[in-house]
């Protein structure tokens, strides 16, 4: 049975539940549940603190886990676990920040104190850049550290930047890490059931980005129409009772759907229909 670690709370928890549910896996109904067995799919889910997931997978206690790339890298378990799929949600950036106007470059941090909850990420960055600064560990609310005299700057995960702005801070220097939700796996032989999980998750990600389009068009306009709707590989073309007409089915990217419909209508297509894709295997 495949053992999967899932965030039990926080920004990643709900999105992780949704993608797994769309992939056909049972999910807990009570947030107090710590373990859920899905016998039909031969999977066991363990609901853990997002920060601990990489540790459990890295030690081989659990097979795979859904967590943030920032948390995975911060745990420093790359030798015993690996990132195998980006999941496209929970995007953020690990950045340096300080009160507005304090610093303009990371080079100005030499000999200064940097507060963070991501010691592993920050130490790796300092080592990579050769920057000599003191790391001050805090479990959270690092924005207050400068005002309270504990640090001169902070290194933290930034999503919208609203929290920093409210604290009178701004980011500076380069982006240290671009993060998003990822699937990680323990090192060594791939566990049984992982390939099915990967196919299902990939199918959900594709289904979220694409829609199905159906339309009728005159046979002599088919080439022009299919140039607008080439699909992933090739559109499906079916004859109609009226031999001068054909029916076309293809996949188009969801953000392009209305533009494509307009172009097809202008070409002469009619009966243009968009439908959602709930699952797909490629």
From Swiss-Prot:
Its main location: cytoplasm. Its EC number is 2.4.2.17. The keyword Amino-acid biosynthesis applies. Keywords: Amino-acid biosynthesis, ATP-binding, Cytoplasm, Glycosyltransferase, Histidine biosynthesis, Magnesium, Metal-binding, Nucleotide-binding, Transferase. Pfam families: HisG, HisG_C. One of its GO terms (biological process) is L-histidine biosynthetic process. GO terms for cellular component: cytoplasm. Feedback inhibited by histidine. Its cofactor is Mg(2+). Coiled coil: none annotated. One of its GO terms (molecular function) is ATP binding. It is found in: Cytoplasm. Pathway: Amino-acid biosynthesis; L-histidine biosynthesis; L-histidine from 5-phospho-alpha-D-ribose 1-diphosphate: step 1/9. It comes from the Bacteria. InterPro entries: ATP-PRT_HisG_long, ATP_PRibTrfase_cat, ATP_PRibTrfase_CS, ATP_PRibTrfase_HisG, HisG_C, N-reg_PII-like_a/b, N-reg_PII/ATP_PRibTrfase_C. Disulfide bonds: none annotated. It catalyses: 1-(5-phospho-beta-D-ribosyl)-ATP + diphosphate = 5-phospho-alpha-D-ribose 1-diphosphate + ATP. Catalyzes the condensation of ATP and 5-phosphoribose 1-diphosphate to form N'-(5'-phosphoribosyl)-ATP (PR-ATP). Has a crucial role in the pathway because the rate of histidine biosynthesis seems to be controlled primarily by regulation of HisG enzymatic activity. HAMAP family: HisG_Long. Belongs to the ATP phosphoribosyltransferase family. Long subfamily. This is ATP phosphoribosyltransferase. It comes from Micrococcus luteus (strain ATCC 4698 / DSM 20030 / JCM 1464 / CCM 169 / CCUG 5858 / IAM 1056 / NBRC 3333 / NCIMB 9278 / NCTC 2665 / VKM Ac-2230) (Micrococcus lysodeikticus).
């Amino acid at each position: 049975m495949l053992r999967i670690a899932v965030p039990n709370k926080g920004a990643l928890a709900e999105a992780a539940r949704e993608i797994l549910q769309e992939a056909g896996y049972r999910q807990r109904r009570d947030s107090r549940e710590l373990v859920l067995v899905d016998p039909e799919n031969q999977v066991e889910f363990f609901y853990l603190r997002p920060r601990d997931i990489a540790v459990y997978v890295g030690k081989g206690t659990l097979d795979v886990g859904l967590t943030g790339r920032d948390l995975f890298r911060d745990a420093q378990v790359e030798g015993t676990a690996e990132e195998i799929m980006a999941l496209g949600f929970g995007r953020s950036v690990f950045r340096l920040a300080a009160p507005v106007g304090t610093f303009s470059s990371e080079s100005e941090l030499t000999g200064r104190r940097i507060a963070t909850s991501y010691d592993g990420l920050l130490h790796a960055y300092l080592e990579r850049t050769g920057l000599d600064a003191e790391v001050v560990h805090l479990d959270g609310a690092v924005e207050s550290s400068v005002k309270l005299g504990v640090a001169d700057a902070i290194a933290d995960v930034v999503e919208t930047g609203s929290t920093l702005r409210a604290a009178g801070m701004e980011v500076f220097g380069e982006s240290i890490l671009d993060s998003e939700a990822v699937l990680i796996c323990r090192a060594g032989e791939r566990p049984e059931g992982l390939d099915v999980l990967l196919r299902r998750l990939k199918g959900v990600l594709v289904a979220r980005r694409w829609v199905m389009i159906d339309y009728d068009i005159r046979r002599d306009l088919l080439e022009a129409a299919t140039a607008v709707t080439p699909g992933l590989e090739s559109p499906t073309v079916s004859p109609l009772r009226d031999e001068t007409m054909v029916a076309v089915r293809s996949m188009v990217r969801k953000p392009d759907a209305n533009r494509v419909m307009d172009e097809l209508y202008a070409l002469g297509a009619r009966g243009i229909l968009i439908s959602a894709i709930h699952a797909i295997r490629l």
